[in-house]
């Protein structure tokens, strides 16, 4: 049992606070206050650290890490796109250069095919009016000249003046020759002005135009009248395919009594009665004056 003293002492002890207890409580409050700012500063430091090198493993640190990752990923994607664009541009330039080369080769191939197709020089100029390739033009001209030379060589080559000795021979000369051959017949009689000049010109032109058949016949052989002999000689008749395509009487009225092969050539070309010459093989007929001077002393029957 408790005594009255114990109760009194106990109550005193229960409700009694000593000064030492107050001091202890003050110390505890100070310690508590001193520790509180330290604990509150920790999250701030952690947050700042999270914004720097992401050492914080909290929610904010994870978010910052994710944002940084997405930023790096975007930059890498943009760099890849730029690299791809550079590669595409490089490839396109390479492809364009190759296409240009193929296009140029195709143009040259087409040009060669057109040349092989034997088209005329006018058609060639029209099809290639935007191209100024002198090398191919020269090649085309050379090929055309070669073709003309071969065409002339396909037919007979005469290169001389044939003397017709009878009326029947005169008719056979006209009717039995190939239809593509041009025949020039000089009707003459000795002593008539211009006869020797015409005979000399015929010899020179026969050498210049081997595909043309040059002939001569006396008017008396073919039974011409004396009036024709006096008024029409020297006469030049041109036949092709059995048809008379040119008839020139008293040629001296146009050329004079003394003329040269170049004069007769120009006269016939004016009427389109001479074919194209072999430019690559034959010399110009304008040098025929020498030929005429050499043959002027020859006696032609």
Swiss-Prot record:
Main localization category: other
Gene3D superfamilies in the record: Glutaredoxin, Phosducin, domain 2
Phosphoserine sites (modified residues): 20, 25, 226, 293, 296
Pfam families: Phosducin (PF02114)
Residue ranges of every copy of the Phosducin domain listed in the record: 36-299
Modified residues (N-acetylthreonine): 2
GO biological process, one term: visual perception
GO CC annotation: cilium; cytoplasm; cytosol
Family recorded in the similarity comment: Belongs to the phosducin family.
Function per UniProt: Acts as a positive regulator of hedgehog signaling and regulates ciliary function.
Protein name, UniProt field: Phosducin-like protein
Name of the gene this protein is made from: PDCL
